Amino acid sequence: MKKFLKLTLAVALMACSSSVFAQKFGRVDLAAIIPNMSEYKEASANLESYAKDLQDQLEAIQVEFNNKLAEYEKTAGTISDSVKQLKESELQQLQQRYRDFSTIAQQDLSNKENELMTPVFELANEAVKKIAQAGGYLIVFNTANAAASGIAYFDEAALTDVTAEVKRELNVVDAQ
């Protein structure tokens, strides 16, 4: 009985150890894929257009402020103190409006970037997942941001590069 127990334990240990060694690990360079995706290019163009609209609005406030400031400086010597105070108050309000709009525009731009880019990154991650599952990979490392993810070192040569497979899955062609 003891021999049977030892034999069973030995077989179980060998089965466990062989399954550990049979695991496949891959790597992918998403930085080489995502910028070439048509979805990324479209999202980037939309984000750039949105940023330009916000910048145009900000510049319009700046132009309005500059015009009112020039008018104030031109007439400052000829207007009453009460009108001066009114114009100064108006200028301060415009400055505050500029600062407020600038802050809101930065937040809006960040939100818009998340809104536009999140689906692109999700699409890329889904393609990696599909390739990993089809290829039997336990883990696929993104070499583009390995250090940022807390991985101090890994031997890239020991990992199977699945970048080309992910590109094919996403119909990505490298930019020329």
Short names for language-model regions:
Residues 1-8:
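Bacterial N-terminal signal peptides that target proteins for export
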Residues 16-22:
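Sec/Tat signal peptide C-region and signal peptidase I cleavage site
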Residues 23-176:
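Amphipathic, charged alpha-helical segments and their helix-to-coil junctions
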